[in-house]
Structure formats: structure tokens, C-alpha cells
């Protein structure tokens, strides 16, 4: 009988880190949503989860400093690496020409910088 792995990740259900966990862990898993990177680490340190999934680096925006800080401040260490493709969507009513301002997470805005600049959209980090 195999033991179900519990994996903590930062974000809501459907987050890229949850998707990475589901894609890369074999067998049945349970994913646990956390509101901060620190909480992700605390879940694994406190044995609520077996593993933590943290975004460490992005090919466009570089390192994710908050993840490094959380990991460095813990007793945990990296045991693997996952490459996970990120694809963003701009969703709304109307056409692209109707859009004036895009509100999103700073990482997402940075990852979509070329697209946003091509359309001259204003951006607001949230």
C-alpha cells in the first residue's frame, strides 16, 4: 500500500505551483493551499505536509526572492527541481482594443511585459 503524499503550495486552487505538484508527483497526492511562502514551508516543517512546492526562478523575471528567503530561513532543503511552463490569459468582456488597464500580480505583469507594451496597456500590480 502506498502512502499519499501531501504537498503544500502558495496560492489558490488552480495555481501554477499546484499544477506543477499534480504533474510531477506520481500516484495519488493531496495538495494544501497556503497564503504565503512562509506558510508553505511551515506546513512541511510542522509535518502537516510531506513536501513544499516553491517557485524559485522564472526564465523571464528571474529569481523569486520571497521563496529563497522562506527556504533559507527554514530547516528544509531542495530535494528536486520541476520545470513548469507558465501560460497567462487575459480574460474579460469586449475586445483587446477595449482594454485600458491590466491589474495583476507583479510577477505576471513582468512575465507578460512585451504583450502589455505592444498594446500600450497601463498596468497596476495587485
Please place each PLM-identified region on the residue numbering.
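Domain-level signature for soluble enzymes in the chorismate/prephenate branch of the shikimate pathway
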Residues: 1-126
Amino acid at each position: 500500500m502506498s502512502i499519499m503524499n501531501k504537498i503544500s503550495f502558495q496560492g489558490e486552487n488552480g495555481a501554477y505551483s499546484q499544477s506543477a505538484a499534480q504533474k510531477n508527483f506520481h500516484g495519488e497526492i493531496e495538495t494544501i493551499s497556503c497564503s504565503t511562502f512562509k506558510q508553505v514551508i511551515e506546513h512541511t516543517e510542522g509535518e502537516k505536509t510531506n513536501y513544499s512546492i516553491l517557485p524559485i526562478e522564472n526564465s523571464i523575471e528571474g529569481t523569486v526572492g520571497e521563496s529563497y528567503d522562506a527556504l533559507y530561513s527554514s530547516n528544509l532543503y531542495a530535494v528536486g527541481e520541476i520545470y513548469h511552463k507558465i501560460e497567462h490569459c487575459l480574460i474579460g468582456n469586449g475586445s483587446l482594443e477595449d482594454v485600458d488597464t491590466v491589474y495583476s500580480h507583479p510577477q505576471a505583469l513582468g512575465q507578460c511585459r512585451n504583450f502589455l507594451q505592444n498594446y500600450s496597456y497601463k498596468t497596476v500590480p495587485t
